[in-house]
C-alpha cells in the first residue's frame, strides 16, 4: 500500500502589529489597517465642506475666477466644477473615484463621495473613502446684475423703415428665427417704424448688422457713447448704437424711377412694379416685361419712393384681355421676364359697376388673368400723387391703371390656412389695431410667392382641421403644400421642462 504524499503548501507567516499586537500579514508599515488609520489620515488638508456660488436668475454656477457655467444637477459638468474647487488640496493624493450622493434638490447641499489613495509609512498604500459637502450659496452674476440695474446692454441695433406697414419686419423676424440670431439678444423692443435689438456685447450687434446687410437692401451707421473711464488702468466703457435704415420700397409697390436710373437699367420705363425684395429690389416694367435689380448702394445714390400704399389699392374686374405675343425690346434694353406674360386688358372698378366707365392698361399678369377675375391695382387717373419724377413725366407715358395682383376671398383663404409661423418674444410699444390686417397680408404674400417662403420655416398648425376641396368653392387661390411644412416640435412636451426627467405614468 502506497501513500500519496501531498505537496507542501506554501504559507506566509503572520506578524504582530507593532501597536496593538494583532496577528497580521506582513506589510511595510508592520501595522494593522485600524492602527494605520489612527496614525495617518490621508484626507488631512482636504476640506470636508466647501462653498460654491449659484446665480438664481440665469441658473449658472461660478467657475473661478470670473466665469459662469450652466450645469444640471448630478451632471459631469457639475462634478468637474466641484473637483476643481478641491484640486489644490488634493495635490498629494491620488483620486480613484468620485460620485454624487443623493440630496434634496431644495436643500442647497451637494454631496460627493471621494475615493483617494496615498503612499504612507515605508511605502504602504492606504485607500480611504470620505464625503465632501458643497454648500450652494446665492450670488448674482454680472450679466444678471446689469439686467436688474437696467444697465445691461452694451450695443443696440436700431432697424427702421419709413413705410406704413410692418410686412418687412415680419419677414425679417422669420429669417432671424430660422438662423437663431435672436438668442444672443438681451432685449427686443418693437416701436413705431422699426424694432430695436439690445446686446450684451458689441460683437453680437455687429453680427446682426452684417446679417441685415446680406438680407435686405439697407444702409447702416455706427456711433458710440462714453459711459465711464478709468484713468488708472486707461480703460473705457462705451455703449454702441447701430442705426440700420431699410429702403422704403416693399413688394407690390408702384414706383417711379428717375430718368437717369431708368436709362442705366436698360432704358426701361420709369413706372415699375416691385415684385420682390431680397438683398436687392426686383422691378418689372408692366408695359414691356423688362426686369431689373436695384441693390442698396444704387438705391441710395438714386432714391425713389413708393407711389401708393396697400390701402390705396382698388379692386378691378377683368372685362376683356388680349395676350401680346412677340413683344420686342429696343436696342440697349435689359433682360425680359420669362415668368410673366404681357397682356392688354380692359378693367372696371367693382365700386363703379353701375357705370360704363372702363380703363385700358397693360399688365404683366397675362398668364394668371381671365375674364371675370378680380385684381388689385392702383388708379393713376384719379389719384393725387406728389412725386418729383412722376410730375416731370410726359402724361401720355403715365398709365391710367397699374395692376398689382389677383384678389381672392380673404375669409376662404384663412379657413384653408393650416399652417403657422413662430414669433419672437419682444416688447411692444403700443398696440396697433392694424397689425392683424398687416400680418394677414404677409401670410398671403407667402402663399403667393414660392421664392419668398423658401427662406423661412413654416409649421403645420395642428389646431386647424384641413378643409376638403369639395366642401367649399375652389377660387384658385395659391396655397402652401403639406410638403413645405414642418412639424412644430417642442422638447418641453415630453419632459415637462428643459432638461427634466422623462414623464411616465
Curated annotation (Swiss-Prot):
Keywords: Cytoplasm, Nucleus, Protein transport, Transport. Transmembrane segments: none annotated. Residues 467-505 are annotated as: Disordered. InterPro entries: Nmd3 (IPR039768), Nmd3_N (IPR007064), NMD3_OB (IPR048898), NMD_SH3 (IPR048899). It comes from the Eukaryota. GO terms for cellular component: cytoplasm; nucleus. One of its GO terms (biological process) is protein transport. It is found in: Cytoplasm; Nucleus. One of its GO terms (molecular function) is ribosomal large subunit binding. Its main location: cytoplasm. Belongs to the NMD3 family. Acts as an adapter for the XPO1/CRM1-mediated export of the 60S ribosomal subunit. Associates with pre-60S ribosomal particles. This is 60S ribosomal export protein NMD3.
Amino acid at each position: 500500500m502506497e501513500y500519496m504524499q501531498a505537496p507542501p503548501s506554501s504559507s506566509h507567516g503572520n506578524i504582530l502589529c507593532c501597536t496593538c499586537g494583532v496577528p497580521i500579514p506582513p506589510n511595510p508599515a508592520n501595522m494593522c489597517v485600524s492602527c494605520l488609520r489612527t496614525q495617518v489620515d490621508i484626507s488631512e488638508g482636504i476640506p470636508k465642506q466647501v462653498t460654491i456660488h449659484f446665480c438664481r436668475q440665469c441658473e449658472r454656477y461660478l467657475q473661478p475666477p470670473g466665469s459662469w457655467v450652466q450645469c444640471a444637477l448630478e451632471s459631469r459638468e457639475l462634478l468637474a466644477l466641484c473637483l476643481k474647487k478641491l484640486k489644490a488640496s488634493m495635490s498629494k493624493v491620488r483620486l480613484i473615484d468620485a460620485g454624487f450622493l443623493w440630496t434634496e434638490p431644495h436643500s442647497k447641499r451637494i454631496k460627493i463621495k471621494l475615493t483617494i489613495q496615498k503612499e504612507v509609512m515605508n511605502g504602504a498604500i492606504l485607500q480611504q473613502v470620505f464625503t465632501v459637502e458643497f454648500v450652494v450659496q446665492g450670488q448674482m452674476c454680472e450679466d444678471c446684475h446689469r439686467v436688474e440695474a437696467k444697465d445691461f446692454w452694451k450695443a443696440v441695433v436700431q432697424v427702421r423703415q419709413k413705410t406704413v406697414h410692418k410686412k418687412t419686419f415680419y419677414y425679417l423676424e422669420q429669417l432671424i428665427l430660422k438662423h437663431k440670431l435672436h438668442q444672443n439678444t438681451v432685449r427686443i423692443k418693437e416701436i413705431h417704424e422699426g424694432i430695436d435689438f439690445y446686446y450684451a456685447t458689441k460683437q453680437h450687434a455687429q453680427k446682426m448688422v452684417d446679417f441685415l446687410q446680406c438680407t435686405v437692401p439697407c444702409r447702416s451707421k455706427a456711433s458710440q457713447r462714453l459711459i465711464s473711464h478709468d484713468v488708472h488702468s486707461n480703460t473705457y466703457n462705451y455703449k454702441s448704437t447701430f442705426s440700420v435704415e431699410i429702403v422704403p420700397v416693399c413688394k407690390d409697390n408702384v414706383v417711379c424711377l428717375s430718368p437717369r436710373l431708368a436709362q442705366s437699367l436698360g432704358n426701361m420705363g420709369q413706372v415699375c412694379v416691385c415684385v420682390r425684395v431680397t438683398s436687392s429690389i426686383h422691378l418689372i416694367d408692366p408695359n414691356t416685361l423688362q426686369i431689373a435689380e436695384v441693390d442698396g448702394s444704387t438705391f441710395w445714390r438714386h432714391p425713389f419712393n413708393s407711389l401708393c400704399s396697400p390701402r390705396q389699392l382698388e379692386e378691378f374686374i377683368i372685362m376683356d384681355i388680349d395676350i401680346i405675343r412677340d413683344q420686342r425690346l429696343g436696342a440697349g434694353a435689359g433682360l425680359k421676364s420669362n415668368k410673366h406674360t404681357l397682356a392688354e386688358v380692359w378693367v372696371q372698378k367693382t365700386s363703379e359697376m353701375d357705370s360704363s366707365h372702363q380703363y385700358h392698361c397693360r399688365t404683366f399678369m397675362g398668364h394668371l388673368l381671365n375674364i371675370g377675375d378680380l385684381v388689385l391695382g392702383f388708379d393713376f387717373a384719379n389719384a393725387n400723387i406728389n412725386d418729383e419724377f412722376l410730375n416731370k413725366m410726359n402724361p401720355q407715358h403715365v398709365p391710367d391703371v397699374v395692376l398689382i395682383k389677383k384678389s381672392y376671398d380673404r375669409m376662404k383663404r384663412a379657413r384653408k390656412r393650416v399652417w403657422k409661423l413662430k414669433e419672437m418674444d419682444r416688447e411692444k410699444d403700443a398696440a396697433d389695431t392694424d397689425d392683424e390686417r398687416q400680418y394677414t397680408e404677409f401670410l398671403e404674400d407667402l402663399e403667393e410667392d414660392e421664392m419668398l417662403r423658401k427662406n423661412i420655416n413654416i409649421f403645420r398648425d395642428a389646431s386647424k382641421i384641413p378643409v376638403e376641396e369639395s366642401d367649399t368653392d375652389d377660387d384658385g387661390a395659391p396655397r402652401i403644400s403639406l410638403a413645405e411644412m414642418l412639424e412644430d416640435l417642442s422638447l418641453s412636451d415630453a419632459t415637462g421642462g428643459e432638461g427634466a426627467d422623462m414623464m411616465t405614468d
